[in-house]
Amino acid sequence: MSTRRDLPQSPYLAAVAGRKPSRVPVWFMRQAGRSLPEYRALRRQHSMLAACFEPEVACEVTMQPIRRYHVDAAILFSDIVVPLRAAGVDLDIVADVGPVIAAPVRTVADVDAIKPIDSQSIAPVLDAVELLVAELGDTPLIGFAGAPFTLASYLVEGGPSRHHARTKAMMLAEPATWHALMTKLTDLTIEFLLGQIRAGVDAIQVFDSWAGMLSLADYRQYALPHSARVFATLAEHGVPMTHFGVGTAELLGAMSEAVKPGTAKVVGVDWRTALADAAARVQPGTALQGNLDPVVLLAGWPAVERAARAVVDDGRRAVDAGAAGYVFNLGHGVLPQTDPGVLTDLVSLVHSL
């Protein structure tokens, strides 16, 4: 049973559901994290993974950008590899590298060794959600997970990869092993997101960070069916669902197909694709989210203001072209060197437009 709140005044929830919001809603991927001095102070006492499994710490980090920026949505502080850790995978998040897997998954036996997760193994994450639901007031909470393809890539490569060569080799040369791995990861992702929904998140986002490395044909064959099963299983719970990847211009239409009609669905767009162009690629009834280049935030306020105004105008053109709604965001996560004051001013600007 969901403990989800009724938030009829939320601009974010209105936009993603295809209703007219009271203002352009804005939040930022990685709004909670390395750009905030209060986060860096807290991290001196906790590793990244430890923070994800400490409910009070995860709650505090999630709340920090809400207090500072007054964004229209909170996103749970976590990491896409958290459910892998809960499933018994030996991994760490290494500074300036990312997730590193101690024993990469290369064989059927490796796939078989991945354990399922349950509410007990992710209890600290769900406890953090419940703390946040009690503290956020009228601000909606977005839960999230990594898409099966992106999780598989980390497991097979052993960490971040430029070419994803081992991942693609398994896909193409050992499709049975590949789909067995993807089936396990799909089950894991579903359980992780269902737990968050039952604990009270108001929306979810699935990050397919590495999907842009695939051709459209390979994406449709090796990744989309598994992501679609995640969304199909969650659809009955009625939460808005966002599908996001980087470098996915040619995949946007297929990504929008993962969420079936009748559900509030959003596709995230990176800075390489105009929002109005994205509106022509996605399925009818799809809202869009994006897509300011995060690097623009390092270029000084005149450049930020100029670019942000252009993005909001593009978002409005996208709605005129058929997008169900529009949410302002970056095209990827906030960079660590970003001045928090710029983000505060950016939120105020977007709200004024």
From Swiss-Prot:
<dbReference type="InterPro" id="IPR000257">
    <property type="entry name" value="Uroporphyrinogen_deCOase"/>
</dbReference>
<feature type="binding site">
    <location>
        <position position="79"/>
    </location>
    <ligand>
        <name>substrate</name>
    </ligand>
</feature>
<comment type="pathway">
    <text>Porphyrin-containing compound metabolism; protoporphyrin-IX biosynthesis; coproporphyrinogen-III from 5-aminolevulinate: step 4/4.</text>
</comment>
<dbReference type="InterPro" id="IPR006361">
    <property type="entry name" value="Uroporphyrinogen_deCO2ase_HemE"/>
</dbReference>
<dbReference type="GO" id="GO:0006782">
    <property type="term" value="P:protoporphyrinogen IX biosynthetic process"/>
</dbReference>
<dbReference type="GO" id="GO:0005829">
    <property type="term" value="C:cytosol"/>
</dbReference>
<dbReference type="Pfam" id="PF01208">
    <property type="entry name" value="URO-D"/>
</dbReference>
<comment type="subunit">
    <text>Homodimer.</text>
</comment>
<comment type="function">
    <text>Catalyzes the decarboxylation of four acetate groups of uroporphyrinogen-III to yield coproporphyrinogen-III.</text>
</comment>
<keyword id="KW-0963">Cytoplasm</keyword>
<keyword id="KW-0456">Lyase</keyword>
<feature type="binding site">
    <location>
        <position position="209"/>
    </location>
    <ligand>
        <name>substrate</name>
    </ligand>
</feature>
<feature type="binding site">
    <location>
        <begin position="30"/>
        <end position="34"/>
    </location>
    <ligand>
        <name>substrate</name>
    </ligand>
</feature>
<dbReference type="InterPro" id="IPR038071">
    <property type="entry name" value="UROD/MetE-like_sf"/>
</dbReference>
<dbReference type="GO" id="GO:0004853">
    <property type="term" value="F:uroporphyrinogen decarboxylase activity"/>
</dbReference>
<feature type="binding site">
    <location>
        <position position="332"/>
    </location>
    <ligand>
        <name>substrate</name>
    </ligand>
</feature>
<feature type="site" description="Transition state stabilizer">
    <location>
        <position position="79"/>
    </location>
</feature>
<keyword id="KW-0210">Decarboxylase</keyword>
<protein>
    <recommendedName>
        <fullName>Uroporphyrinogen decarboxylase</fullName>
        <ecNumber>4.1.1.37</ecNumber>
    </recommendedName>
</protein>
<keyword id="KW-0627">Porphyrin biosynthesis</keyword>
<feature type="binding site">
    <location>
        <position position="154"/>
    </location>
    <ligand>
        <name>substrate</name>
    </ligand>
</feature>
<comment type="similarity">
    <text>Belongs to the uroporphyrinogen decarboxylase family.</text>
</comment>
